[in-house]
């Protein structure tokens, strides 16, 4: 699925070339059973998304992991567009770190893309011994022939934002990317851009704080993150810490795809803001708030005010549109970022959420809506939960969405999601004027899985996508 080229490596030469890539036909996504009451391992599902296929919207393969309660979460590749110039590299393995068990699974997606096989299991003890890290999150491939995985904590569940390095051929644990003793206080996501000698990482909370659910007292106690860490890419050390105003729980971070661009965006979940980070003329980095989703005053909920809870963000490959999900309020949003300092709302669509009519929550004061949104019903299925993980087609015309965040928080905020399972939906995107419209004929119902309702999470295409591939 690479650009046509006589001597090319994986992926595409540029983000704009990637936009010309083939339409997605299958999608991989992890399905979680931890906290659901079903004593079964998490598994990697393969879903057919080709409208011409007789198996359209069906799970066509399930690869169960050999252990229980891993909490599969995010995934990355053995190699991607960062290695486009190396014809010896090919995108054949999907790397799945486990958020809770700290196990890493390497899945063979190259031999038979529609019938995946487990290639290797990296046990937690190997990571603990060589890296003193645990609770693993984001996986990115590097042009150096390595895979880099971020951590949330140490072996005891205290906060520690470090990075595990794997050999991308043998998948042996090589050690940490950062210098010994140089980890950030907390960790979560990261994105690198070698042209500017920079990596920036984000932070959630220590594993001991978030493992079993959300306690508002932990926010008051300052146990949740509110910083970005700027790293020197060549020296592997933190050179700047950016404190975020109105930036509690900065989660997903995205540089612009154009590797010359020295700016990007991060979604701050609890504050429900989008912050733009950028490089100054002097070479240091700054951050500014560019979008604020106002909280809603409510009755019948955990707190008197409900944040949107921005949990995932994406940038289209042409760096024109930014998308994000408000998991609690229930809406997906599209912003035109042609002027990155002044994003302009161009599309909004409600996909479930906590404030739907007829639910337990009453909205008392709302700065944005005149009435509470209707519950979403697709093909007879009432959608539980709210929009969470999102993935955009290469051409930018289709947005896929799942509804599970993290099993412990799902159980707390959306107990019906545990009972009924999550769903995968597809939204049609207007890339000319802007706009979002639900495809009423698309539904993958993970409530009907053979072993019981499952929680489906992050989406990946076999040929790469706009949140896994980094151009250098």
Curated annotation (Swiss-Prot):
The gene it comes from is SELENBP1
Task: Enumerate the Pfam families for this protein.
Answer: SBP56 (PF05694)
Q: What are its E.C. numbers?
A: 1.8.3.4
Which residues, if any, are the signal sequence?
none
Query: What are the GO cellular component annotations?
Result: cytosol; membrane; nucleus
Query: What does the entry's PTM section describe?
Result: The N-terminus is blocked.
Which residues does the record list as N-acetylalanine (modified residue)?
2
Q: Which family does it belong to?
A: Belongs to the selenium-binding protein family.
Q: How does it sit in the membrane?
A: Peripheral membrane protein
Localization terms from the record: Nucleus; Cytoplasm, Cytosol; Membrane
Which enzyme class?
oxidoreductase
Q: What is its main location?
A: nucleus
Q: What is this protein called?
A: Methanethiol oxidase
Gene Ontology molecular function terms on file = methanethiol oxidase activity; selenium binding
**Please, which domain of life does this record's source organism belong to?**
Eukaryota
Report quaternary structure and partners.
Interacts with USP33.
Report keywords, A-Z: Acetylation, Cytoplasm, Membrane, Nucleus, Oxidoreductase, Phosphoprotein, Protein transport, Selenium, Transport
Please state the pathway this protein functions in, per its UniProt record. Organosulfur degradation
Q: One GO BP annotation here?
A: protein transport
What this protein catalyses is: methanethiol + O2 + H2O = hydrogen sulfide + formaldehyde + H2O2 + H(+)
Keyword flag Oxidoreductase: yes
Tell me which residues bear Phosphoserine: 111, 371, 467
Q: What function does this protein fulfil?
A: Catalyzes the oxidation of methanethiol, an organosulfur compound known to be produced in substantial amounts by gut bacteria. Selenium-binding protein which may be involved in the sensing of reactive xenobiotics in the cytoplasm. May be involved in intra-Golgi protein transport.
């Amino acid at each position: 699925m690479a650009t046509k080229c006589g001597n090319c490596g994986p992926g595409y030469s540029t983000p704009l070339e990637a936009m010309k890539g083939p339409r997605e036909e299958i999608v991989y996504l992890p399905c979680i059973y931890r906290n659901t009451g079903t004593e079964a391992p998490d598994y990697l599902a393969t879903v057919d998304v080709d409208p011409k296929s007789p198996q359209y919207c069906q799970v066509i393969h399930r690869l169960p992991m050999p252990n229980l309660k891993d909490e599969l979460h995010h995934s990355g590749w053995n190699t991607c567009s960062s290695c486009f110039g190396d014809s010896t590299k090919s995108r054949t393995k999907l790397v799945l770190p486990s958020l809770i068990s700290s196990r890493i699974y390497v899945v063979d997606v190259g031999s038979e893309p529609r019938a995946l096989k487990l290639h290797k299991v990296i046990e937690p003890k190997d990571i603990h011994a060589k890296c003193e890290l645990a609770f693993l999150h984001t996986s990115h491939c590097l042009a150096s022939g390595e895979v880099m995985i971020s951590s949330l904590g140490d072996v005891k569940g205290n906060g520690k934002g470090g990075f595990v390095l794997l050999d991308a051929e043998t998948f042996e644990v090589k050690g940490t990317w950062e210098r010994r003793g140089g980890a950030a206080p907390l960790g979560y996501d990261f994105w690198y851009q070698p042209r500017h000698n920079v990596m920036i990482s984000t932070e959630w909370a220590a594993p001991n704080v978030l493992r079993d659910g959300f306690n508002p007292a932990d926010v008051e106690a300052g146990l949740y993150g509110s910083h970005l860490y700027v790293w020197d890419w060549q020296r592997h050390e933190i050179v700047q810490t950016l404190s975020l105003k109105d930036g509690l729980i900065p989660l997903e971070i995205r540089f612009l795809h154009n590797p010359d661009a020295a700016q990007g965006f991060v979604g701050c979940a609890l504050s429900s803001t989008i912050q733009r980070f950028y490089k100054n003329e002097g070479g240091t980095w700054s951050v500014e708030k560019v979008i604020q989703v106002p909280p809603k005053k409510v009755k019948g909920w955990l707190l008197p005010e409900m944040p949107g809870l921005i949990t995932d963000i994406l940038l289209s490959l042409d760096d024109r549109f930014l998308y994000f999900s408000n998991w609690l309020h229930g809406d997906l949003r599209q912003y035109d970022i042609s002027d990155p300092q002044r994003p302009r709302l161009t599309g909004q669509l409600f996909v479930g959420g906590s404030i739907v009519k007829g639910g337990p929550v009453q909205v008392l004061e709302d700065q944005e809506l005149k009435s509470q949104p209707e519950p979403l019903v697709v093909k007879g299925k009432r959608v539980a939960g709210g929009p969470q993980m999102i993935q955009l087609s290469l051409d930018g015309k289709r947005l896929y969405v799942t509804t599970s965040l993290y099993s412990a928080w799902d159980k707390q905020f959306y107990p019906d999601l545990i009972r009924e399972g999550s769903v995968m939906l597809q939204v049609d995107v207007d890339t000319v004027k802007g706009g979002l419209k639900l495809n009423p004929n698309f539904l993958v119902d993970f409530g009907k899985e053979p072993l019981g309702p499952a929680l489906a999470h992050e989406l990946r295409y076999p040929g790469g996508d706009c949140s896994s591939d980094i151009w250098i």
